[in-house]
């Protein structure tokens, strides 16, 4: 009997949660013909935030994350201010016949004011978005142009897709 009340309480309390630092996209496609790519970050909080950003690999088979440099890796973003995170190629070789994918992590760390004898719980929100490097050899190609290379199949109650194209594909309804 108490589980429905817990679920209702959780739903009501979640409406008050918000991220202070908002990233300006769900993915960043790095054009191989350019030297860098930029994504915006905005502080929607009433206090300053420290913004920390870094790259991580998608899986063990991913190219090394040191193929890029994030600048600035750590900076202060005042209340209501917009900033930019720039991703720059380091010169390390990446495959030029297919896309490479990494995770771009952008964490907003809110400022706190020390108040003696008061307990405070505070969360730092980490936004994890896709960084897709599209080599110069694939410039102008779109996922739609490679749709016929997808192999669709059925396994019991699920649908499987094998991607034989050099591009990463995203699906939505």
State what each model feature region is:
Residues 92-138:
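Terminal connector regions
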Residues 37-43, 87, 102-106, 158-163:
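Buried hydrophobic-core signal for structured, non-transmembrane domains
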Residues 148, 153-173:
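Intrinsically disordered, low-complexity segments enriched in serine, threonine, and glycine
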Residues 1-4:
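Positively charged n-region of N-terminal signal peptides that target proteins for export
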Residues 13-16:
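N-terminal signal peptide c-region/cleavage motif recognized by signal peptidases
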Residues 19-40, 141-154:
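Beta-sheet-dominated interaction scaffolds and their linkers
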Residues 44-62, 165-173:
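Short acidic, flexible loop segments centered on an aromatic residue
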Residues 62-94:
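Intrinsically disordered, low-complexity Pro/Gly/Ser/Thr-rich segments with frequent PxxP/GP/PP motifs
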């Amino acid at each position: 009997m108490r589980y429905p009340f817990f679920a209702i309480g959780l739903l009501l309390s979640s409406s008050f949660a918000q991220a202070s630092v908002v990233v300006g996209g769900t993915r960043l496609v790095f054009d191989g013909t350019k030297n860098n790519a930029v994504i915006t970050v905005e502080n929607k909080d009433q206090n300053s935030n420290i913004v920390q950003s870094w790259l991580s690999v998608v899986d063990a088979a991913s190219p090394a994350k040191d193929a890029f440099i994030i600048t600035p890796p750590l900076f202060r973003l005042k209340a209501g201010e917009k900033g930019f995170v720039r991703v720059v190629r380091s010169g390390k070789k990446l495959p030029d016949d297919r896309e490479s994918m990494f995770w771009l992590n952008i964490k907003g760390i809110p400022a706190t004011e020390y108040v003696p004898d008061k307990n405070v719980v505070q969360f730092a929100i980490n936004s994890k978005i896709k960084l897709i490097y599209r080599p110069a050899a694939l410039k102008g190609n779109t996922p739609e142009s490679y749709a016929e290379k997808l192999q669709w199949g059925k396994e019991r109650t699920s649908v499987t897709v094998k991607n034989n194209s050099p591009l990463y594909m995203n699906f939505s309804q």
